Amino acid sequence: MLGSEYSKVSLFRVVVFMTKAHEEYMEYALGLAVKAQGRTSPNPMVGAVLVKDGYIVGEGFTNPAGGPHAEIVALTEAGKSAKGSTVYVTLEPCAHYGRTGPCADALIAAGVKEVYSAIEDPNPDVNGKGHARLRDAGIPVHTGISQSAAAEINKPFFKYVVSGQPWVTAKFAVSLDGKIATNMGESQWITGEQSRQRVHHMRNVTDAILVGAGTVLADNPNLTTRLQDNTDNIRNPLRIVVDSSGRVSPKARVYHPDTPGNSVLATTSQAKASHCKQLESQGVKIWNLPEDANGRVNLNSLLDKIGEEGMLTLLVEGGSEILGAFVADGLMDQVCA
């Protein structure tokens, strides 16, 4: 009897130990995934780890669109050691042909032993097909480890594949009198240096930033990314100026050809053709969009357009008018004050 009880305790300890090990490997894979933040659109951030005999033999995270996915990077690093390994991946392996081949097929061909997948991919092209293909090949698939964390890091992708629109985050500063002030101009900052650097870090991992015409007229910002650290990995997101009637001068910094990155004028038929033509000659793209009931750019149509361009994330940095419009239309997903 005592031996039987001892065996149960020992088995329990083994189960707890293995569960903890699975969680730790998945957490490591999640850490890899976030290294790709802001660099994978329209694909999700994914991390993958291959483990064999208690050692990590391969790891990777998703490359920019068109490049290898996390699983392929990990398989390449593992080489022959991939055979018989256990895979920990933060999102269901894809099962369709896009710019690259199906990751599920690559895992099968490599001879992996089993797969731990944090969460199913809601993309209609995948949506359980990757897991099914692995199981059909005789590879056990376990899901649910670190599921909440995996869903959290890919909220923008999950929204995108369902709605076709980007994840919208608002960033604004509030003065002591409770008023919203723009926080991207050179002369109108009301926040400290630490907060300003935070904004630049947010820009560095977002696909597009958006301001209204009023902000540009008041502050004439560059809307570029300026980091004090990690300067080798700076990215300037697409700059979108919402200007329904074309009030902002082509001489504005945001439109200047020497300003790093690309700019877009989101406007309506109210803007003069000559104004748009001048901006186009400076390399600015023109998005002529429908008007809303107030004669302004229809923001829902604008989000559709951003999604069509394959962008998953949008940072709204405008003042009270543009922020209020997004809130009124129910288009805000997240707010950072």
Report residues per predicted region:
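Short beta-strand scaffold segments in enzyme catalytic cores
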Residues: 45-52, 172-173
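Zn2+-dependent cytidine deaminase-like catalytic core
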Residues: 50-149, 238, 264, 268-271, ...
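Short, basic/aromatic recognition patches
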Residues: 21-41, 160
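N-terminal amphipathic/basic-hydrophobic helices that include classical n-h-c signal peptides
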Residues: 1-17
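Residues at the N-termini of beta-strands
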Residues: 114-115, 208, 313, 334
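Residue-level signal for inorganic ion chemistry
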Residues: 29, 47, 94, 134, ...
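Active-site ligand-binding patch in enzyme domains
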Residues: 159, 167-176, 180-312, 321-324
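Short acidic amphipathic segments
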Residues: 326-334
